């Protein structure tokens, strides 16, 4: 398992005494410790990770002379040899290239141990040199330059960053914990352990070590790969079959190797050299040696017993001559280190070959390359006999290969299946060289398992992530030429894989490119790839960006690469640097690769052929088109295009017709609106306002009688039969209203006889039972008017006491038509009673709401609105105030001695004066003239001539009023009546002239609403006034 090479030096062929080439890194002075020390193996990265720290004594850490800890503690210096330092370039600044970076990092359980260097002259010695021999492994990358992930944890550069990480507490500055150094004297507490081991990280989870402190594990290039799920045993265990070597220090500062059997773990490092970490103690380039980050295994303890090894003597077949580490070692064409979900115990590490074996394998590789026989890769059919973890070996084991130059009986040839030191057990079913495990899902390509989803030889599936080189993996021809790696499988009869002719780096890149496209349904796995010193010398380290951005970029680029492979147009060069290298690196190599890939993809587009096909496609035929489907689609699209054009033309025609129809309809609507506007402008709208029971409704009736064919129809009916039908219906309704007026008149007079002061007595007391009958039916609803009602009403109306009470009607509310209907009882009681127009004019119906009447006079349209005159109805007038031509204000002139129904206290004439004033001064009506109808002139003459109710008793101003000179009395009119009616007129004119602004005028008229001729004459006079108002309204006058 590579223990000998780890203990006695790495004497791989082609690495000894090779002079440095031009451009290579110069040889740096190594670290040294004074004193003689037998050549022996230093601790491996596993020891550095797993060795428990002694907690007795702190170790100072210094940076450019600045101490970051307690003073130094003198201790014995050790002179140790390890070729890993020379391989890494001594003290040169080193950061693994993207192709060699690990795709992930893990939380380090501990960083114990140290990584010694070769002794070279010229390097400072002394106590500092002693610390420098142990200290570089103790340093963190960000110990002095920035934040570090955790105590003793290692933060890889972006090339090594993985898409996930384990939580580590951030520590900043120079706050590194004090490292305890045990007493190195013989018998001291740290005699059995490795001095200078740093303490474990607090988050490291591992079981307690069995045995004493210290231990040994081979260096990275000799360790074997591991699985995440418990394959790696970690700690300081040697490979299976070897006992653990405990380095003891005696008084002479010499190592004494003592073999002990104890519970061990397999080393968690695979073919990774120690890393130079910036900020090292005493390093000229501010770098320190750091083992690569690995996971800590969680497998159960395994007892391995074996003979003790003595450090200082090389076993048979191993040459411990110092070699020149500046020349790049020969890397293997092994498979990438994989990390799967389940442990794979078949994998074992094999020791590196000795010089003779390396030479023989190089010769076999040259022969294979000259004969065009490709080297069997990890995914070849012959690779089923090889282990999946051959990345850590110099050459895989070949149990039965006669051409390899090694016999199975030779214990040093690496092919003896029974050699406990070789680590290659041919008979072991778990061994990678066992040919009896062809169906393993992680094997390269077993001939007996062609349907294996992870098999790299699946004919139609892309290469498995674990398969080293699948024959069907999509790769550009230039990729194979650039990488110079043979990825085709070997012949089936090849019993053992041979060493590849190309470098391990190029082969690993090809395998990683093929592994970027997982098989359908296969679970994608994460690989650990071995480093390549060739590229590490060519590609300098790049500054490390923020970790989060690097991971974010990696995940996105990985998804992008999967898309390319799913489409089947990807090249192996796109992923040759690995899953994380595309995002982690930003140097010239990545730029050059991307530039080369772009140049390579351009010739894929044959512009000339595309042009010719598009221009002369009909001549050459569609079969010659590079895109036959697209051409057929164009052909197919021609038919829908013509259909679409016809459909569009049809839709355009329909839309044009629709627009034409809409335009015509719009014109008709506009014409109708214009006509209505003209008719509205030519219509005179008249608003009837006034106090209650002033005669407004009677004026409307008169307009119907005069201009709407009376009550023979509703007006506007062209059919005479319809007019007669409406007339009969309306007259029938008015009969009931007339009977109700008769009943209300007799009831009001009889009830007022006892309420008046002084009360009025009946002239004939025998009519008392008649009074009682009338009072009993006063509040009966839906009275049917029997004949006895008419008899009692007629008898009471002939009584002198009832007549006397009627004369005092001004003291109570009595309808004006009471006397008219009481005088016609004999006519009304008849069953075939048909009211006359005068009866309809006299009928009193309470108006509630707004009633409108349309009529035409001499081809002039009038629209008259009747609004209730009661106080609770006046709030509805506002609806008719907008844009009226004139207001006809109606006043009951005979009501000077009457009170309103609302409170029985306010004089009706005074109420009319107040209402007129409010309308005249209304801000909405200041431009509208008022036609004043002083109505009920017949009743006013009767009261004035009767002399029972004097006007001066209610209006004292009448006593001083004199008839004006411009007064025009009616023919045969009494002067007292003339004086009274002009007094009432002047009362309203006084209001209009007092607040007149010249914008509206008041036109008074004396009217009698029940006199049709009077209303006709008055309305004819008002027509001229209304016409002038109308012209002034539209600014035409």
UniProtKB/Swiss-Prot annotation:
Coiled coil: 641-667, 730-756
Post-translational modification ADP-ribosylarginine, affected residues: 844
Region (G5 motif): 1007-1012
Biased composition (Acidic residues): 572-583
Region named Disordered: 1-105, 185-224, 283-588, 640-666, 711-734
Signal peptide: none
Span list, region G1 motif: 685-698
Catalytic activity field: GTP + H2O = GDP + phosphate + H(+)
GO biological process, one term: adenylate cyclase-activating dopamine receptor signaling pathway
Chain ranges passing through the membrane: none
A single cellular component GO annotation: cytosol
Region (G4 motif): 931-938
Subunit-level organization: G proteins are composed of 3 units; alpha, beta and gamma. The alpha chain contains the guanine nucleotide binding site. Interacts through its N-terminal region with ALEX which is produced from the same locus in a different open reading frame. This interaction may inhibit its adenylyl cyclase-stimulating activity. Interacts with MAGED2.
Other comments on record: This protein is produced by a bicistronic gene which also produces the ALEX protein from an overlapping reading frame.
Protein name listed in UniProt: Guanine nucleotide-binding protein G(s) subunit alpha isoforms XLas
Lineage: Eukaryota, Metazoa, Chordata, Craniata, Vertebrata
